[in-house]
Amino acid sequence: MSRKIAFAASDMPVAQTARTALAARFGDVPEDEAEVIVVLGGDGFMLHTMHRTQALNTPVYGMNRGTVGFLMNEYSETDLPDRLAVAEEEVINPLRMNAQSRNGTVHEALAINEVSLLRAGPQAAKLRISIDGHLRLEELVCDGALVSTPAGSTAYNYSAHGPILPIGSDVLALTAVAAFRPRRWRGALVPKTATVRFDVIEPEKRPVMADADSRWVESVLWLDVRSETRIAHRLLFDPGHGLEERLLREQFS
């Protein structure tokens, strides 16, 4: 028996056309009644949908109708129920960010890929880094820094020369962005259970902004990041094309 499907599509015409065709063929129920949510778009829309539907605990299966499709399966209109029946599930825990801005407001957000700090002015940022309350780096002079999940390690983290992490690994990637001093410091692997804290040095002279999956906070004074294990995103992939295989392919491409 086919599973009840809810379709979610980005605003791109190709995604909307695909939704119309698939809904006519397989039906389309409200998301809170669905047994699986099929996402049509690219990785950006997939992340948006995962955040939006996280309280439903419904597995999500993406088909690429966008530009970047690392989290997506190949698009096909003909065999969707069969693909869903044999799809393999990956579970991803997001990061939780708390960041205080100069006006005293503490902002909270979740990130599936990474939380990043970036300079917001012409001068390099100066950051102090602590892990679980222990000072680890007195001063990092850089364009920024980020903390990445294994699922996000092939995105901005990899572009910043951070390591690709196996899915399911109990570590997070802490990666510097264009580090000037210490010159040779690129980052570190930290336990998934750790809380990473950044304190901004000279925040008025060297303003810094934070980003959690495109949720921006300006004029940051401090920021902490930890894995949110109470939230689990369930992603479905075609057999042999899960995140582990994609991570391997990325390293040899």
Q: Residue locations for each model-derived region?
A:
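Proline-centered loop/turn at the N-terminus of a beta-strand
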Residues: 57-59
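Short glycine-/acidic-enriched loop or helix-start segments at secondary-structure transitions
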Residues: 17, 48-50, 71-72, 157-159, ...
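Catalytic core of DAGKc-family lipid kinases
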Residues: 68-144
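Gly/Ser/Thr-rich active-site loops/lids in small-molecule metabolic enzymes
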Residues: 139-183
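ATP/NTP phosphate-donor binding region
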Residues: 1-40, 46-55, 75-91, 99-109
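Short glycine-rich anion-binding loops that position phosphate/pyrophosphate groups of nucleotides
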Residues: 42-45, 66-68, 151-154
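ATP/nucleoside-binding phosphotransfer catalytic cores, i.e., glycine-rich phosphate-binding loops
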Residues: 109, 117, 122, 132-136, ...
